[in-house]
């Protein structure tokens, strides 16, 4: 497992962003684990998370000019990544959107850097149904930006539905024609659990969940 994947999963565990047990998802599925990026709620945690995101995207070679964070959780994540990149000597513009357009002041739906004619990297927590990411893609294109890729914290690698055996991330990547990168995946989580004595007992429920809902490439 790549170092940034292991660091991210350990960080998520420390922050209580990654929990094990029984959780009912929005889809109605009963999951043995749950990820909540909202638990990265301090400067230190966000700084370390920004480093994990930066390492993950650096490993891909994707070229981009602007970092974009979809409202709401994507905003602090994109900001943390942009700050980390600046620490590494790469100063990049940052942009994000409001959920509702503002009618006064500077107005509009977008805040931050101009994206017109620029290659834009979307930074978010997860892709569940893909609705928020598709909305972000539309916002970027409407602003004249060119979507270059998407990076998320965790890819659950599970099928979107009984009729679509792609994951939500795979579906978005195919529809948009851009790569979707994950800092870590369900496969990484299984490896991580196997190597952690405190988590090894959760491996069997994780394996069973993957066997039932995992995309075919990892079953």
UniProtKB/Swiss-Prot annotation:
GO biological process, one term: pyrimidine ribonucleoside biosynthetic process
Cofactor(s) the protein requires to work: Mg(2+)
Protein EC: 2.4.2.10
UniProt-recorded name of the protein: Orotate phosphoribosyltransferase
Keywords (A to Z) from UniProt: Glycosyltransferase, Magnesium, Pyrimidine biosynthesis, Transferase
Annotated organism of origin: Stenotrophomonas maltophilia (strain R551-3)
Pathway linked to the protein: Pyrimidine metabolism; UMP biosynthesis via de novo pathway; UMP from orotate: step 1/2
InterPro entries to which the protein is assigned, alphabetical: OPRT, Or_phspho_trans_dom, PRibTrfase_dom, PRTase-like
Pfam short name (any one): Pribosyltran
Residues involved in 5-phospho-alpha-D-ribose 1-diphosphate binding: 26, 72-73, 98-99, 102, 104, 124-132
Catalytic activity, as annotated: orotidine 5'-phosphate + diphosphate = orotate + 5-phospho-alpha-D-ribose 1-diphosphate
GO molecular function terms listed in the Swiss-Prot or TrEMBL record: magnesium ion binding; orotate phosphoribosyltransferase activity
Role description: Catalyzes the transfer of a ribosyl phosphate group from 5-phosphoribose 1-diphosphate to orotate, leading to the formation of orotidine monophosphate (OMP).
Subunit structure: Homodimer.
Keyword Cell wall biogenesis/degradation: no
GO cellular component: cytoplasm
Residues reported to bind orotate: 34-35, 128, 156
UniProt family annotation: Belongs to the purine/pyrimidine phosphoribosyltransferase family. PyrE subfamily.
